[in-house]
Regions:
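N-terminal start-of-chain detector that recognizes signal peptides
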Residues: 18, 34-39
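Short aromatic/hydrophobic contact patches that present stacked aromatics
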Residues: 17, 26, 64
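Short aromatic-glycine-(Arg/Gly/Cys) micro-motifs in beta-strand/loop hairpins
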Residues: 3, 8-22
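A short, exposed loop/beta-hairpin motif centered on an aromatic-Gly-Thr core
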Residues: 23-32
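Short, charged, surface-exposed hinge/linker loops at domain edges
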Residues: 1-8, 37-69
Length: 69
């Protein structure tokens, strides 16, 4: 059975970091694709060891904050 999860990818220095907020897993890679593939593997391994109950997907939104330039 396949489940759909969210991946958030951002760059930190010379690496890309990928996170799955539903599960709490994270991984990294030298490219976006590598980080994403590593996250898929890490999440799959995690879920084999710690199966999760059905849950709602997190709300992903944006917000604005005043910043002094």
């Amino acid at each position: 059975m396949n489940k759909l999860f969210t991946a958030i990818v951002h760059k930190e220095r010379n690496l890309y970091v990928a996170e799955c907020p539903e599960v709490g897993t994270a991984s990294q890679g030298s490219s976006i694709e590598e980080a994403f593939n590593n996250l898929k593997e890490a999440t799959g391994l995690y879920l084999e060891e710690f199966p999760q109950q059905e849950s709602q997907r997190p709300l992903l939104t944006t917000f604005e904050v005043a910043v002094n330039a």
